[in-house]
Every structure is written in C-alpha cells, then in structure tokens.
C-alpha cells in the first residue's frame, strides 16, 4: 500500500492514492497516442487505494478519476470527469490550457453549485509520469556548510542562463544550463556558498496570464510537490527532468556548493472555489484544504492565492513532510526556504510556533538536518512573525531590508536600528536563545526592486504586467539619486554605483547570513518593475553583456564576499557583547561605537534623529568561539565607517588601545584606489554617502594560554 504515489521496482509499478471520501477510484493509463485505459483500483486499506501493475515501465503516463460525493456547499468536490494528478507524482508532463473542462462548474452559471460540469478534462490537463528512481550519485555528499559560513545566492533557473552566451543554446534556461561548468565557475569565483532556486516544484501557468501573452515566471503556484518543473528540462518530461535535476545538484555538490529550494507548501495552484480541479480538490478536498467554517464552499485564504493547505490535517502534514524528505534523500538538496511560512504555523486560526508542523520538523531525523529558512509572514491576521520561529530555523529578516534601505537614503531616526541590524538583530532573535544566523539578511530579493532599480527609481513601473501599474508594492524605500530611471548624467550614475557598493558592503559585513539577489552583483535591472512575477523575458533575465561599470561592481562584490569569509569576526557565531552603559574602564569590548570625533557614542548620539554616520570597532582578538580543531579563533581587528550624509565627514580613528596601525581595505567612494595606511588617532575622510573599512595590520595569534 505504501509508499504513496507510483513506485517502480524493475518489474512493474505500484500505485497508491489516499482519499477518505472516494467511493471508487480509477487508475488511467495513457499510451503514445493519448488513448486511455482505465483500471479500477480494487485494493483499499485505511483510505489508501492501491494496485500493482506488472510490466509497466518508467515513462508511463497516468492520472486518476475519483468517484464520490459532489456537494461543494459541504466541501465535497469529487468529479470523475476530471483527470487528476497524483499528489505524489515524481514527474509531470504538459500544462493546462484553461479549457472549461478543467473546472467543476459551468462558465455560464458559476454560482450554480448543484450543476456539475461533466466535460472530460483529460485532453486539457497535465499527466503524471512514472520515473525510474535509480541514479548514479557516485560519492555525492551534502556539503553541510555551516550557517555562519554561508552566503546565499537567490537565482531563477531560466533567468540565470537564458541570456548567457557561454551556455549552449539548447540548454539555456534549464537545469542542465544551470549546471554548465562556466555557470558554476562564475558562482564559485563570486564566492557564494549556496544557490537558492526560486520554485522548481511543478507549477501551473495561469490562464489569465496566458491570455495577456504573459506567464507565471516566478512559479509560486505549485501543483506537484514531488516533481521538478518540466519546462526547466532540456531532456524530456516523462522522468528525464528528474535525472537532469539530480545531475545539476551533483555538479553543485562536486563544486562544494549547496542547493536550497524555495518551496511553496502554503497553497496550491487550484485556487479558490472558482479555480480548476486538477488534483487535491477532486481527490479529497476537505482533507487537504482549509475551508471556511459554516461555509465550506469557500476556502480560507491567508496567502492571497485563493486557498491554504489545512495544517491540522494529518494527511496534508504527511504530504508536506514526505515531500521534504524526498527532496533531501532522493534529490539531495541541502535546504529549503519556505514561502509565506507563517501559514504553515496556522494549525488553527492563529500563527503558533508550537504547531504540529514545527513539532514534526524538529524531531524528523532527515528534515531537521538541512537548512530551514522561513519567509516569516503571510497575509492573514497576525501573520508578520519576524523573530517568532523556532530556534533551529533562520528567517528572512524583513526589518533588516527596510532599515538598511532607509539608512542609505538618509531617513531620520534610523541609526539605532541600523546598528542593531548590522550586529545580527539580537533584539529579534537573542531572547529565545537564537544566534546571529537566525537572521537571513537581504536588501533585495525576487519580490521588489533589484539593487540597481532601488537606486534608480522612486516609483514602480509595472505597466508591462497589464494591470495599469496597480500591482506591486508602492512603498519601496528607494531613492533614484535625483533622476527617475536611466540617465546620462555622470554624477547621478556615479552616486548610484556608490549606493550599490554601500549596500553590498553593509550586507556582507553584517552579522547573520547574507543573501544576494541573483544579478544584483552585475547591476541587473527590471526597468523599474518591482513585481515581475509574470515577465519571462528580458525584463527578468540577467543580461550577461557586462560593460566596464558592471564588471567593476562584480569584482567589488566578489572581493567583499571573500573578505567576509576569510575573517571570522565578520561572521561570528555568537552575538557581540559591548560596553555596558556608564562603563568607562579601559577594557576593550568585543564591539565599540564611536562618533566622528573618535569619542564613544553616548545616549545623545543615538537619539539624534539626524545622525547618519558612525564608526564601529570590531575586536578580532575576543571571539568566544573555537575552530574545527578546538582552537580558539582569533582575527584581525576592523573599523567600519558609515556615512549616509550628503556631505563628507572627517573621522578621527580610535586611540592606540584599539590598534596602532590600520590599512584601508574598502572604500566605496574610491573602490579601485590602492590600500592606504593610517595610525591611531589619525583623521580619515568618509566622502558623502560612502563606507570605509580598515583592518589592523597586526598578525592574528592565539590568545595566551592556548
């Protein structure tokens, strides 16, 4: 009876489907001419319908027809006229075309729930495919890169390589293209340690987008939680996409990099009561979806997509955890970023970090060992949960994004929170014993402006989406540096380049886990579109024809990443401890905060609403951590200088207690200048809107007694 799904054993295939409401289930097999053979599933145990069919081979296409009650008013939507995808399908062929047969109601009378649409959907929907599970992994192993040593690169399978002339044309925009040696070599040289792929679970192309000549580019519309998206395969749709994906993961592991998946377990592509019947709705609607109490025709929606999975249902929970285990054990992925993860915590009405889902994940010996990253919000009441996830999770830190953007556009009263975000957001995470790596720091991501657009546009420009520029976030916390969009004014372009360097330096020298939005390192633009979910074209794809300025930005970002990874004080495992208020002793703390005069900042400095500058000392000799060999870590000391003012500021370096000699290693105003040396108490100019980093010239050595 188990496992669920279609399991090939070399001699045949076992099919198993869960449905509590089904009265009869037919397995539908399709030949090369799409002729359908129906086989009634005669075996049933504990609501699992199963049959073993000898002689079937990988590549066999199939689906299900489920007979049972059709009573939408009570949440029952069985309709045997609809060919249904296997929820556990490991491969899926085709797409949907928006035909009326995909829906369980008639277009002419959508409100008449008693009139069941009896059109057959088989010719208009996707089909599940049997796969061969055997694959030569060789000696492949998970890299298991420590959280604090991680630098994440968010990427899109198609967007990463579609315009990459180094990749052969026939594999651009595919898993094979992403695994092409020059692509992996580029990421290794950049210095990132993990690629986080936007959704690659099989998703649906919405008909309303297709009618406008657009498509679901981002992929947050999952219908197959076990199947890699077929459109990203260069080798076929009947299982070939599985091997192509595995080969990609194997190539990244060989290069010492991790593969993290952006997963969407909070809803499915079947939408609300007006959506199509593709799988779960027709199999056992009430076991998978959260329905409105007292009005079970409608779906409870905290995701903005029309439905939400029922997180107190053991069968929905089993589906999700089985999927997660499959992607770790069979596909060898190294972690997950959970879209709208607050929905997964809604066992009942409210978000609850003690919900069954988190209990299951915490104790699971497979899932709990990989990286778990939450997008810690959804659209429901109380859905903003930054800092509220269990201790073993990391979170996208939305407050980090907002604060860094505000600081570099000189918004009042941002300095205190900016300082907290730089140090790992202990105010959000330390209270429940978490560490800096609980914070995934980012300034841009797929959703919103790119880094280049963040410094080039004050307003969104989403006209290409066909929604009258009404979609997308209006409050972007962006600043166009004086001109909206592209310009030939040298001073404006110079400032934009400097602002991008400022934000990259902030991101890569903050405690926590940095995440870079793919293409930002080469100043990718979406022409001001901050909601390019439907733009599978040059608006979203990365343009790899790099001019001098884009090449220089790439080199700068790579330099910063390697500098971060080479110095443990820049990515500590524990939060800093600083000087207590009123402490005027000569003890040198782990971190010290100075104003531009070289004086330790006091309460008046922090409360100055128009303060946009500071100097930070990081003590590399006081790192309470050990390396892999049990030796206490030591590092150089660093000084970080931030100036978000519109004019230059002269900073006096700290006295010699903090270090005698310093070398300038990063200057966002003059990124190509040779390194200069400074002594304690010397003055150094931070140009307007710029960042400086100085490193002590002392050689790190073990503390006495070790």
Language-model regions: role of each:
Residues 17, 64, 155, 197, ...:
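Conserved, mostly hydrophobic/aromatic
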Residues 151-153, 195, 259-261, 336, ...:
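Hydrophobic faces of well-ordered beta-strands that scaffold small-molecule active sites
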Residues 71-75, 161-163, 203-207, 267-270, ...:
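Short catalytic/ligand-binding loop motif for oxyanion handling, primarily in non-cytosolic enzymes
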Residues 353-518, 523, 531-535, 568-575, ...:
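Conserved alpha/beta catalytic core and glycan-binding cleft of carbohydrate-active enzymes
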Residues 21, 43-45, 55-57, 68, ...:
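Short, flexible loop/turn elements at secondary-structure junctions
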Residues 1-153, 158, 487, 492-497, ...:
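Carbohydrate-interacting/catalytic domains
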Residues 68-137, 206-221, 275-300, 415, ...:
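Core domains of carbohydrate- and sulfate-ester-processing enzymes
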Residues 121, 156-333, 340-363, 383, ...:
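Substrate-binding/active-site clefts of carbohydrate-active enzymes
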């Amino acid at each position: 009876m188990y496992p669920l799904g279609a399991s090939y054993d070399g001699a045949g295939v076992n099919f198993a489907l869960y449905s509590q409401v089904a009265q009869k289930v037919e397995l539908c097999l399709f030949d090369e001419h799409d002729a359908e053979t129906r086989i009634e599933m005669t075996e049933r145990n504990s609501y699992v319908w199963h049959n073993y069919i000898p002689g079937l081979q990988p590549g066999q296409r199939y689906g299900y027809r489920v007979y049972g009650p059709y009573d939408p008013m009570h949440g029952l939507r069985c309709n045997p006229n609809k060919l249904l995808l296997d929820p556990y399908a490991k491969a899926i062929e085709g797409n949907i075309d928006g035909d009326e047969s995909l829906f369980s109601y008639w277009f002419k009378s959508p409100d008449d729930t008693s009139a069941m649409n009896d059109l057959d959907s088989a010719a208009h929907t996707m089909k599940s495919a049997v796969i061969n599970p055997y694959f030569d992994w060789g000696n492949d192993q998970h890299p298991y890169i420590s959280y604090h040593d991680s630098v994440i690169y968010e990427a899109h399978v198609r967007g990463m390589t579609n315009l990459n002339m180094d990749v052969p044309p026939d594999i651009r925009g595919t898993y094979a293209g992403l695994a092409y040696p020059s692509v992996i070599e580029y990421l290794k040289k950049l210095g990132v340690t993990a690629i986080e792929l936007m959704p690659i679970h099989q998703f649906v192309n919405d008909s309303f987008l297709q009618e406008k000549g657009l498509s679901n580019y981002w992929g947050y519309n999952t219908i197959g939680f076990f199947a890699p998206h077929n459109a990203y395969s260069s080798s076929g749709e009947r299982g070939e996409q599985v091997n192509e994906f595995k080969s990609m993961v194997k190539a990244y592991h060989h290069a010492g990099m991790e593969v993290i998946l952006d997963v969407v377990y909070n809803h499915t592509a079947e939408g609300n009561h007006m959506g199509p019947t593709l799988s779960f709705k027709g199999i056992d609607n009430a076991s998978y979806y959260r329905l409105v109490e007292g009005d079970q025709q409608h779906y409870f929606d905290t995701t903005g997509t029309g439905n939400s999975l029922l997180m107190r249902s053991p069968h929905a929970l089993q589906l999700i955890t089985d999927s997660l285990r499959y992607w770790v054990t069979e596909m060898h992925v190294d972690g997950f970023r959970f879209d709208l993860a607050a929905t997964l915590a809604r066992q009942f009405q409210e978000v609850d970090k003690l919900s069954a889902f988190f209990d299951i994940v915490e104790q699971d010996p497979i899932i709990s060992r990989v990286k778990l990253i939450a997008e810690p919000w959804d659209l429901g009441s109380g859905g903003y949960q930054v800092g509220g996830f269990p201790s073993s999770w990391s979170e996208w830190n939305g407050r980090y994004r907002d604060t860094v953007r505000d600081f570099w556009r000189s918004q009042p009263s941002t300095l205190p929170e900016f300082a907290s975000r730089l140090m790992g957001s202990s105010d959000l995470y330390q209270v429940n014993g978490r560490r800096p790596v609980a914070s995934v720091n980012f300034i841009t991501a797929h959703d919103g402006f790119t880094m280049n657009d963040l410094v080039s546009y004050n307003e969104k420009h989403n006209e290409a989406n066909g929604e009258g520029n009404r979609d997308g976030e209006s409050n972007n916390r962006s600043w166009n540096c004086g001109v909206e969009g592209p310009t030939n004014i040298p001073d404006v372009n110079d400032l934009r380049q400097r602002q991008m360097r400022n934000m990259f330096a902030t991101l890569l020298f903050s405690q926590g886990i940095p995440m870079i939005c793919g293409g930002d390192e080469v100043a990718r633009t979406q022409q001001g579109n901050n909601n390019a979910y439907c733009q599978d074209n040059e608006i979203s794809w990365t343009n790899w024809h790099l001019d001098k300025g884009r090449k220089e930005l790439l080199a700068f970002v790579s330099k910063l990443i390697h500098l971060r990874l080479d110095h443990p004080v820049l990515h500590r495992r524990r939060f800093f401890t600083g000087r207590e208020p009123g402490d005027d002793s000569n003890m040198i703390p782990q971190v010290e905060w100075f104003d531009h005069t070289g004086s330790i900042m006091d309460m008046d400095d922090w409360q100055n609403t128009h303060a946009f500058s500071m100097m930070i000392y990081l003590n590399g000799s006081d790192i309470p951590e050990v390396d892999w060999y049990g030796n206490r870590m030591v590092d150089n000391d660093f000084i970080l200088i931030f100036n978000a003012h519109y004019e230059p500021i002269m900073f006096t370096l700290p006295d010699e207690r903090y270090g005698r000699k310093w070398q300038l290693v990063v200057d966002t105003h003059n990124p190509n200048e040779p390194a200069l040396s400074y002594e304690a108490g010397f003055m150094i100019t931070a140009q307007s809107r710029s960042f400086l980093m100085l490193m002590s010239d002392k050689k790190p050595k073990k503390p006495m007694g070790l």
